[in-house]
Regions:
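Small/polar, glycine/serine/threonine/aspartate-rich low-complexity segments that form flexible
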Residues: 260-272, 497, 555-572
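Short Gly/Pro-enriched loop/turn and capping motifs at secondary-structure junctions
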Residues: 301, 538, 550-554, 587, ...
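C-terminal beta-signal and terminal closure region of outer-membrane beta-barrel proteins
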Residues: 558-611
């Protein structure tokens, strides 16, 4: 009956008197350790459950490979014999990485020995061994190997060698998966989302390759590079099981952004009269991450255009070489022929316009064999052809100004300028947008080839060096950003022929602040220096105190026609002031108010830091 079953279940276990406790297989300290952990004692009663608990307690010490208990009846009571087999003395711990045949593993043997060497020469203790395994797994985590772990530790040889089997998280493949705006990999019909970007554009930015051990730190850098392409709203990683369960497929999930835009406008200006403009931008042309930009302006007086194509990484190139091709027809007011205390214009009272028609190509590559490591040096090489002409507001040629000075090198108002260009940049800044530590060196050489009108032979040399020092002059900005001192010195010279419009213009927002654009001077050579103290105000607003100095080194008169001299530009200028920087998606918006050594003051606007 149910009542009888409950009484049987509640009946206590039989208890027997222990006459003797014997340990077989262990002596000395191990025998003492067993007696320390067991509860069974001679002269006391015991039960089957207590004997099993003693077996478990002996196992829990970690010193034994097998433990059994054998009770026997004797005239004095039950003799309880614990039969044990001690572990061998630990001599060595080796690692077996799976899957088998893996050419390398990331766990150095030295790390293994450092963890387990305190146990060498002692009887293997499985509890201490497990503590060491926990440290091994933590080493993997600390070094970014999040998928790696010890999966088996059961192989122990009689001579004391323990073999740990580890699965380190081998990458079987890298795949790309496109997600919709909601982050789903399929559409309403259950079909996979098809992206515009070609897979290799993404995977070539990923350092992880099939056969590598997955590493979190490497994967994070890979994600930053893919996101840095500028064509995705979101980039993330997921995992899928490989065909071999001991391998993993790394999936790069991307959400594409709209990379194309078109705009149109119309207006009226004194330079172009009534005009209309159309512009087009595409950042991911053909799904190749290539950029195409074009702008056309049609006016009553001029047709202007500017088209540019950039491939940021030539397909198949192992060194991340890029190139840019551009064609243009641009018109601008020249700073060389404008400003100053003495206005010198054209005979008809117009200001000279510089019209440039031409195009060129530039190749750029980082000087590093490892495309996944930021290169200190970047080099560029290119050529450009321009037909340069000096014109008035109506687009008519204007070879001389009102004082009879030639405005072109040929004297006809037209010059042909074919140049080869070489540049090198060494970037050691900690942040390209808001640097507070490091330096930036720029070197440039431009060599013309005499062709066409003017047959110009010139060599232009330029250099610029910036240095950044983190400081803490005040404490009220603590936690809002980094304070820094920023210094820049630059200079240049032109050897050989010099068309006047190619002189170095000094003064303005990118030169000596406090002066209007180009109002300091125009020289064959120049030196310019700036010192700034940059500090945060709130999280998105910063401030700056600055001092600028620029000089043409007395070379203004060596420019054909002496355009700076006839306009009474001083040739040397000093400016100082203060400004604010407002962070925006376009970069820091720079607003500076400068005072010149001539007693003038001026407000300057710009995008990005001066240097």
């Amino acid at each position: 009956s149910p009542e009888t079953q409950e009484q049987q279940q509640a009946a206590p276990e039989p208890r027997v008197l222990v006459g003797e406790v014997v340990i077989t297989g262990a002596t000395g300290q191990l025998e003492d350790e067993i007696f320390r952990v067991i509860s069974t004692r001679a002269g006391q009663a015991t039960t089957r459950s207590q004997l099993q608990a003693d077996v478990n307690a002996i196992f829990a010490t970690g010193f034994f490979a097998s433990v059994d208990v054998k009770p026997e009846d004797t005239p004095l009571g039950v003799r309880v014999t614990f039969l044990v087999q001690p572990n061998p003395v630990l001599r060595n711990v080796t690692i077996n990485a799976v899957p088998e045949g893996l050419e390398r593993r990331v766990l150095p043997q030295q790390v293994v020995d450092n963890i387990f060497s305190p146990q060498y020469g002692q009887i293997l203790n499985l509890r201490q061994l497990q503590e060491g395994i926990t440290k091994l797994n933590q080493w993997y985590k600390d070094n970014g190997y999040d998928l790696a772990q010890v999966v088996d530790a059961s192989k122990v040889t009689p001579d004391g060698t323990v073999t740990l089997t580890v699965a380190e998280g081998v990458v079987e493949d890298i795949r790309v998966r496109f997600l919709n705006k909601e982050g789903q990999p399929t559409n309403e019909k259950g079909e996979p989302i098809r992206g515009r970007t070609r897979d290799f554009i993404i995977t070539r930015e990923v350092q992880l390759k099939a056969g590598d051990i997955f590493n979190r730190q490497t994967a994070e850098r890979d994600l930053r590079r893919v996101f840095g392409l500028g064509i995705f709203n979101d980039v993330r990683l997921s995992f899928a099981p490989g065909t071999d369960p001991r391998r993993v497929v790394v999936v790069v999930d991307v959400i594409e952004k709209n990379t194309g835009s078109i705009a149109a406008g119309a207006g009226i200006s004194s330079a172009s009269g009534l005009f209309g403009s159309v512009s087009y931008q595409q950042q991911n042309l053909g799904g190749n991450n290539q950029t195409l930009g074009a702008e056309v302006q049609v006016g009553q007086r001029e047709l202007l255009f500017d088209a540019r194509f950039t491939d940021p990484w030539i397909a198949g190139d192992p060194y991340r070489t890029s190139y840019t091709v551009n064609f243009f027809r641009r018109r601008s007011i020249s700073l060389i022929f404008d400003g100053g205390d003495n206005e010198v214009e054209l005979e008809n009272g117009d200001r000279p316009r510089i019209l440039r028609l031409g195009g060129g190509v530039t190749f750029t590559r980082p000087l590093s064999r490892d495309v996944f490591t930021k290169a200190e040096w970047t080099a560029s090489l290119g050529f450009q052809y321009q037909r340069v002409s000096i014109r008035d507001a109506d687009g008519e040629l204007a070879p001389q100004d009102e004082e009879g000075n030639d405005l072109s090198f040929s004297g006809t108002g037209k010059d042909d300028l074919l140049t080869l260009q070489f540049g090198a940049v060494r970037d050691l800044r900690n942040d390209p947008l808001r640097p507070s530590r490091g330096s930036l060196l720029r070197l440039g050489v431009e060599q013309s080839i005499p062709v066409g009108e003017g047959s110009i032979l010139l060599t232009r040399l330029r250099a610029s060096y910036s240095y950044y020092i983190p400081v803490r002059f005040t404490n009220f900005t603590k936690g809002k950003g980094v304070q820094a001192l920023a210094f820049n010195i630059q200079g240049g010279t032109v050897l050989g022929d010099l068309p006047p419009y190619e002189a170095f213009a000094l003064g303005g927002s990118s030169s000596v602040r406090g002066y209007d654009e180009g109002d300091v001077g125009a020289g064959r050579s120049y030196i310019q220096a700036t010192a700034e103290y940059r500090f945060p105000i709130i999280s998105v607003v910063g401030g700056a105190l600055f001092v600028d100095f620029g000089t043409d080194l007395g070379s203004g008169s060596s420019v054909p026609g002496d355009p700076a001299g006839v306009r009474d530009k001083p040739g040397t200028g000093l400016g100082f002031g203060l400004g604010v920087r407002v962070q925006s998606p376009l970069g820091p918006i720079r607003v500076d108010y400068g005072f010149s050594d001539q007693g003038d003051s001026r407000l300057h606007f710009g995008i990005g830091e001066r240097f």
